Curated annotation (Swiss-Prot):
Transmembrane segments: none annotated. This is Crossover junction endodeoxyribonuclease RuvC. It is found in: Cytoplasm. One of its GO terms (biological process) is DNA repair. Pfam families: RuvC. InterPro entries: RNaseH-like_sf, RNaseH_sf, X-over_junc_endoDNase_Mg_BS, X-over_junc_endoDNase_RuvC.
Amino acid sequence: MRILGIDPGLRTTGFGVIEKQGNKLAYIASGTIKSDGNANLPERLKTLYDGISEVSRTYAPDCAAIEKVFVNVNPQSTLLLGQARGAAICGLVGYGLPVFEYTALQLKVAVVGYGRANKAQVQEMVTRLLMLPGQPGSDAADALGVAICHANGGDTLGTLAGLAPDLVRKGMRVRRGRLVG
């Protein structure tokens, strides 16, 4: 399965393409799509849309994974990030890709094993997991991290959380990290 990971941003959007075969992950490509900071917002969103569409055509992924928007201290920044993310999702869906969404916490836990990992730690682990000769830039590393997150079960924690009410009704509980009943 070929997975395209996206780290959305209005100035710089990272992308990363990996291939999953069994338990092995293989690096295919990564990079960034940059918009002109002097252009108006619609032009910048079109640049992002066109770039995502081109990456999708070039690498022919089977699915895409994208980082969810976090609520920033500055509401204007959050709105702009949401618009960039929307343009990216439109580019992916326009290519016919199923799109999966993950939080930064899910990405960090999947890649580093620690939800408060910093960008440098994510870059280092992405480099090691994909056996890259050098570290990708932070935006590309985050995009590769989202792809790795999806490849390694994606929203397993969310699925388990959805099962929790049924398990509690059946008398099951978690003790020392194990499900007991």
